[in-house]
């Protein structure tokens, strides 16, 4: 592992069944959300968890250990509040955000955008971006899904590795 410059944001590599990708955390903008994602990653919470929802040209969603899209908890208990920052927008592919069921309902689920999604701005906490492995995100985004946006063939996070 190469040394990272001091003061650079933490990163997490997600090794998936379709290859690895790495996300850079926006710790200054979303500290509680980043802390949640980093700690869950360190604990192995996301290991062997499915990407349960993939919508072409929209998002790749995962982080629910039940694989249903209805589960998952944060390190703070059940749910925690949004950290919406007006400077951060879903301007393109590779934006890492929290999935939620409405305001202040963040748990463990997250999504990565596959294209600009301005309709999500102000509704989902953006807490990072894909900094390496965008080709893996593109492959994930093109898998065949059923009529509920669930992949026909399982795609999952095999393990996560925090790079401090």
Swiss-Prot record:
The gene is CYP18-2. Its EC number is 5.2.1.8. It comes from Arabidopsis thaliana. It is an enzyme of class 5 (isomerase). It catalyses: [protein]-peptidylproline (omega=180) = [protein]-peptidylproline (omega=0). GO terms for molecular function: peptidyl-prolyl cis-trans isomerase activity. Belongs to the cyclophilin-type PPIase family. One of its GO terms (biological process) is protein folding. Ubiquitous. Keywords: Chaperone, Cytoplasm, Isomerase, Rotamase. It is found in: Cytoplasm. Residues 12-162 form the PPIase cyclophilin-type domain. This is Peptidyl-prolyl cis-trans isomerase CYP18-2. Pfam families: Pro_isomerase. Gene3D superfamilies: Cyclophilin-like. PPIases accelerate the folding of proteins. It catalyzes the cis-trans isomerization of proline imidic peptide bonds in oligopeptides. Induction: Down-regulated by pathogen. GO terms for cellular component: cytosol; endoplasmic reticulum. InterPro entries: Cyclophilin-like_dom_sf (IPR029000), Cyclophilin-type_PPIase (IPR024936), Cyclophilin-type_PPIase_CS (IPR020892), Cyclophilin-type_PPIase_dom (IPR002130), Cyclophilin_A-like (IPR044666).
